[in-house]
Amino acid sequence: MNSLHQIKCRLLRWLWFIVILAFVSATLGTLVEGSLIYAGEQNAIHRIRQREQMVEKQIRQRGIKDENVLAAMKSVPRHLFVPHSLANRAYEDNPLPIGFDQTISQPYIVAYMTETATLTRETKVLEIGTGSGYQAAVLAEIASEVFSIEILPELATRSRNLLNNLGYRNLTIKSGDGYRGWPEEAPFDAIIVTAAPDHVPTALIEQLAVGGKLVIPVGRLQQEITIVTKTDNGTSTVQTLPVRFVPMTGEAKVREIDR
């Protein structure tokens, strides 16, 4: 009988031990999960504040007035469009490398080119040079339809996946040479080019709707933002801002050599 009693006592102790262990594990798990959620929420709040500071101090104060552009820049999480190692620098007003000898444009230039294109909720936009996908995301926050061409297949795939994951459904990306635009989807109310040829491609002007604007950096070492507006009688062209973009490759480079 004593032996049976001892066995029962041992079993009860083991059962209590298992119950206590399960309780401690569940409590620790909840605490860890809660800590991770809290850390994630704090990081999200931090990124929102960084975007607000970027817009107010680097963009609005430099003369960007279009509230749709400012709201789009506050909304798009730029840190997701740069390498993880550079995420803490994402909201500096600087271009950053994204691999493949390409860069993401500085926030002010993105805002400037977007505002210059004069977008509305009904605008259909073509972007030449998807790159990281950041400019395309800003455009998609404002315009009704965005089409973007990237000459590097790896970047096109990476950007498409990221933008899909972020929920952009009014944006279409394809891999190809953007020098001749996207004639199947023309005309466009605005065309933004994020790589610099040494001349304005004629095909892009032809794909503008009347009243539409082409915003493009033009030049080799010395580049300027060039704005071409299509009118009933032809086009008007102005140069506005000195910039430094990566050169446009593909057919643009071949034609540069031929000139």
Question: Model segments located where?
Answer:
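N-terminal secretory signal peptides that target proteins for export/translocation
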Residues: 1-12
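Short amphipathic alpha-helical segments with coiled-coil-like heptad repeat character
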Residues: 2, 81-83, 212-213
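Intrinsic low-complexity/disordered segments
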Residues: 2-3, 30, 132
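Generic short N-terminal amphipathic or hydrophobic helices
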Residues: 6, 17-19, 36, 150
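Bacterial N-terminal signal peptides
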Residues: 16-33
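Class I SAM-dependent transferase core
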Residues: 34-126, 137, 142, 157, ...
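Conserved nucleotide-cofactor-binding alpha/beta core module
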Residues: 118-234
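Positively charged
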Residues: 254-259
